[in-house]
């Protein structure tokens, strides 16, 4: 699990996003610096459920990875 979390963090930092499966459910961790119709500027990391498009916002990638570590125990693939 720790190797997958490390790979997720490294990929997200290098490409500004990473997708992964948790119990065969797709998620994406992505950095949002500018987004939305009005180009809202933010410096946050979003964890997005790719089935419902619900997101959780984190101020740092480390907080996002820690939340994933504590709440997702079935990560099978880092894409």
From Swiss-Prot:
InterPro entries xref list: Uncharacterised_YqkC (IPR020157)
Annotated protein name in UniProt: Uncharacterized protein YqkC
Lineage: Bacteria, Bacillati, Bacillota, Bacilli, Bacillales
């Amino acid at each position: 699990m720790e190797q997958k979390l490390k790979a997720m963090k490294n990929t997200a930092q290098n490409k500004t996003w990473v997708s992964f499966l948790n119990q065969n459910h797709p998620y994406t961790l992505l950095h949002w610096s500018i987004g939305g119709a009005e180009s809202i500027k933010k410096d946050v990391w979003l964890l997005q459920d790719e089935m419902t498009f619900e997101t959780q916002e984190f101020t740092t990638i480390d907080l996002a990875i820690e939340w994933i570590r504590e709440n997702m125990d079935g990560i099978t693939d880092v894409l």
